[in-house]
Regions:
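Bacterial N-terminal signal peptides
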Residues: 8-18
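Proline/serine/threonine-rich low-complexity linkers at boundaries of modular beta-sandwich domains
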Residues: 20-27
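Extracellular acidic, Ser/Thr/Pro-rich low-complexity tracts
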Residues: 47-52, 64, 100
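Short glycine/proline/serine/threonine-rich loop/turn segments at secondary-structure transition edges
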Residues: 102-110
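Functional-site microenvironments in short loops/helix caps that host divalent-cation chemistry
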Residues: 132, 138, 200-377
């Protein structure tokens, strides 16, 4: 199991946060790197802790393109490469001899990544979900969603596909007999098409129902005391109505959604790259066989797997997610505020506490969208009700 933190010589402390992949992961923080004057030696200091008091193997990855890729070889590393960690953070140090591996000047475009490995293996993701690893990413895009800013996101799971009509119906049927009496029927062009006509409240309640059906702890409650599970009615939930540490299903936050959509790429416009055609995603007049005449519609989830029409490549992104662009707009947890990026937290932002009017974030675009709406950074919001034929969702889970 690994935990990554980043530092830059230009920014003495770029990122410092605790990012658990599970309860006993090692934690690296306060990474600082600086070149020793007159040499090609780079000092790297950091704090490290581990709840299990494991012996950790420390390693370093280095980028010479501002973090886009980490391809600089790092073999000449000395210092605290093996650490007997304790639950209390301890200061440690490494020295990289760049003259051996790089033999160029350490400069402001270089980013250092410190990795602590305890030898543990991550548990497999729940069925139908993928692991989105902890780490930072650049959220936003110049000219689309500004300011572009670095966000640290903790690890979480996300559905590989948008929630299908079949899955919606299965949970809804269980819910109707277990206190979830007002979940709507929804609509879908087929069992394995995404469920449509889902409003935000229904998506949240359905996540709770799915949690209880699978024996997990529900996330959403009817008040800040979190004494009553949210099962019926339309309640404007505050952030303190949410048990963020629960293991049940929930909507992704806007930051989680964008990190997941970008996959393993950096600065990309779409989940697969920077251009789009009808072979990549379902949008207005994209040419798939599910849009006859003037009545376009959804494609089955995961349709763009290499066998789609028009012919194209498998468009699962780097995390294995499908339809993060197109098919249906996807509800996120956050209240929508067009100016939120100017004041959002750097770690695990969960949206503004209040807004002048109630709207929730929608991401990804849909079958009735133009291609601009399908960009990873594109932000939109909608009133929580009603659900319409372009709105759906996928569920997330914490670790």
């Amino acid at each position: 199991m690994k935990l990554h933190h980043f530092a830059s010589p230009a920014l003495a402390l770029l990122l410092s946060a605790t990012l658990p992949i599970h309860a006993a992961d090692p934690v690296v923080a306060n990474v600082v790197s600086a070149q020793q004057a007159g040499t090609k030696l780079v000092d790297i200091t950091f704090d490290v802790s581990d709840a299990d008091s494991d012996t950790l193997s420390m390693s370093v990855e280095i980028s010479d393109d501002s973090g886009t890729s980490f391809l600089v070889p790092v073999t000449a590393l000395s210092g605290d490469t093996s650490v007997s960690a304790t639950p209390t953070p301890t200061s440690k140090a490494l020295v990289w001899d760049a003259s051996v591996d790089f033999n160029q000047q350490f400069n402001s475009t270089m980013v250092v990544r410190v990795i602590a490995a305890d030898g543990a293996s991550p548990k497999p993701p729940p069925a139908g979900m993928v692991l989105i690893p902890a780490g930072p990413f650049e959220m936003g895009q110049t000219g689309i969603a500004i300011p572009v800013h670095t966000v640290m996101v903790s690890a979480f799971y996300l559905d590989q596909f948008e929630v299908t009509k079949a899955l919606w119906d299965d949970v809804k049927t269980w819910g109707a007999a277990n206190g979830y009496t007002d979940l709507p029927a929804g609509r879908g062009q087929g069992s394995f098409h995404p469920v449509q006509d889902i409003n935000w409240y229904a998506a949240v309640k359905w996540c709770n129902a799915r949690s209880e059906k699978e024996g997990l702890t529900p996330v959403y409650h009817t008040d800040a005391g979190q004494g009553t599970v949210y099962r019926t009615e339309n309640i404007n939930l505050g952030k303190n109505f949410v048990n963020w540490s629960a293991n049940g299903f929930r909507l992704a936050t806007e930051a989680e959604w964008e990190k997941a959509a970008r996959g393993t790429l950096v600065g990309n416009t779409y989940p697969w790259g920077n251009s789009i055609t009808g072979a990549d995603a379902n949008y207005y007049a994209s040419g798939d066989p599910f849009e006859p005449g003037a009545s376009p519609g959804t494609t089955p989830v995961g349709y763009y797997d290499g066998d789609q029409v028009p012919a194209g490549a498998n468009r699962a992104n780097g995390y294995g997610l499908y339809d993060m662009s197109g098919n249906l707009w996807e509800w996120c947890w956050d209240l929508y505020d067009g100016s939120y990026y100017g004041s959002s937290p750097a770690t695990d932002p969960r949206g503004p506490t209040s807004t002048p009017f109630v709207a929730r974030v929608l991401r990804g675009g849909s079958w009735v969208s133009r291609t601009d709406d399908l960009r990873c950074a594109y932000r939109s919001g909608g009133t929580p009700v009603p659900g319409i034929g372009a709105f759906g969702f996928r569920s997330a889970r914490g670790l």
